[in-house]
Amino acid sequence: MKRTGILLVNLGTPKDSSKTEVRKYLKTFLSDRRVIKIHPIIWKPILNGIILNIRPKKSAKLYQKICTENGFPLLEYTEKQMENLKNICPEVEVTIGMSYSEPSIETALDTLLSKEIEELNVIPMYPQYSGTTVGSVFDSVMNYFIKSDRIVDIKFIRSFYNNPQYIDYFSKKINEALNESPIDAIVFSYHGIPMSYVKDGDNYPKECTKTTKLIMDKLGDIRYYQTYQSKFGPSEWLKPATDDTLKKLPSKGIKNILIVAPGFVVDCLETIEELEHENRNYFLENGGEVYKYVHPFNGDIEFAKLVKDIISL
């Protein structure tokens, strides 16, 4: 049997919630050509001259709000899933890598290759494919091996938006919440991307829609909405927007909702601050009454079992 390695990849977090560290993180993130497709000659002056002089202060305050004694949830839960995988797959080398912070993907691959692995399984922790996330991870992994004298067998998981265990997990979590109290509708909120990326061929929204449909097929006849959050910049993004939708629902008689974000494997700034707090306030301030958020896997070992199933260990 080949000596196998698993690399779990997530977005990353600032080193801490200081303005300086948040600025470093944002600069790395917003310099990725997969994330921002504007030509560097145009984009760099905007990034360095405007965005990085304004956004870090605001973002630092938000990161301070979500930071716990264990650090930032995204890193905490990603590390927990690494430990879960090590426990259920003791014969496999497992590590994590972050696209825009430490431990970097390069550092993670150095670690795995030092263990003399022969087969590498790369799992971007994004259920739905997008060039802005999974595509960027692919670039980083391939760029690493372009410079390496040693190549191993590589299995790259493009997406798992329709994996039965993944669909079952969210369906069960939603059902548990529905059994606690009646609701008027379910709101599925996915991270948005620019419409221009979709027109260029990114099929992310198709996979989001398929995920929603597969979950709803298990839930039955319940009203639901699919929305997109976290818009950045002036360009057109996927619609409808989560915040706009939540502001309007109470006027339509929908005052008790369940909100779920299947595009997120672990809680992070976008779910904790945007969905649990900011968007909750929008909904309640506009006449909403009950707002319940369904958490993703976080530290639940079911995600590690899902990964094991995906790579057929």
UniProtKB/Swiss-Prot annotation:
SUPFAM superfamilies: Chelatase (SSF53800). InterPro entries: Ferrochelatase, Ferrochelatase_AS, Ferrochelatase_C, Ferrochelatase_N. Keywords: Cytoplasm, Heme biosynthesis, Iron, Lyase, Metal-binding, Porphyrin biosynthesis. Its EC number is 4.99.1.9. Pathway: Porphyrin-containing compound metabolism; protoheme biosynthesis. Its main location: cytoplasm. GO terms for molecular function: ferrochelatase activity; metal ion binding. The lineage of its organism: Bacteria, Bacillati, Bacillota, Bacilli, Lactobacillales. It is found in: Cytoplasm. It is an enzyme of class 4 (lyase). It catalyses: Fe-coproporphyrin III + 2 H(+) = coproporphyrin III + Fe(2+). This is Coproporphyrin III ferrochelatase. Fe(2+) binds at H191, E270. Involved in coproporphyrin-dependent heme b biosynthesis. Catalyzes the insertion of ferrous iron into coproporphyrin III to form Fe-coproporphyrin III. GO terms for cellular component: cytoplasm. GO terms for biological process: heme biosynthetic process. Belongs to the ferrochelatase family. It holds the Pfam family Ferrochelatase.
